[in-house]
Amino acid sequence: SGASWTEEARGTNAIGTALVEGAPLRVQGGEHFLEANGFLTCAASPIFSPQGQLLGVLDISGDQRQSPSHTLGLVTTAARMIENRWILSRHQRDWRLHFPTQAERVGSAAEGILALSPDGTVLGGNRTAMQAFNIAAADWGSLLWSDISPQPLTQLLAQGGHPSETVQTVPLHSGRTVFARLVLSNKELLIRSGRALRPHLAQTPVPQAAPVDALAQLD
């Protein structure tokens, strides 16, 4: 059944406090307020579902005399990567908008991600996107992309080449602009790939075999 790391059972600790605060944090040495844990340094980050539900906590604990200074950054990045992979897996049949912090930093753990239906309904997203667009967990399923940006999804599709490879500048109703990359569902990509191939196949001439003289073959 595991061990309880509530404050009542273990004193102040990173796991229990991260669950309550819903944010990454570190607790070191005497901050645990429990003599038995006074030698520890703990860094923890909560993990949320694409719908904003708290799923658990990722924690790194060790002897504070040997703990590297970047532990909190490491556990925070790892939690973000888990959340992002969860979105990619759960919403592979939906459209996704990825928001890199810079145009050349596509696919980093820090980028925001929103999952959408083809009609523009926002189905879920990661914490970065929720904070960037001021989205609450209660908004999922009722929020539309048109509530966030005046630029239609169809216009994002029409610009540039392959949608999943094209980073575009997108305006927001707030007056800001963001970098965005539209990724279609696996099914939609297959359909569009087939449509793109049909004109090419239709225009490709089929080589004609030279006529064969049947009588000449009897000689």
Segments the model singles out, each with a brief description of its role:
Residues E31-Q64:
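Extended hydrophobic
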Residues S1-G22, Q28-T41:
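Intrinsically disordered, low-complexity polar/acidic regions
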Residues E8-T12, G16, V20, P24, ...:
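Juxtadomain coupling helices with adjacent low-complexity linkers
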Residues S1-G16, L74-T76, Q102, S108-H173:
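PAS-family sensory domains
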Residues A202-D219:
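AAA+ ATPase active-site-proximal loops
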Residues G30-E31, F39-A44, I148-P205:
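PAS-family sensory/regulatory modules and their coupling/dimerization elements
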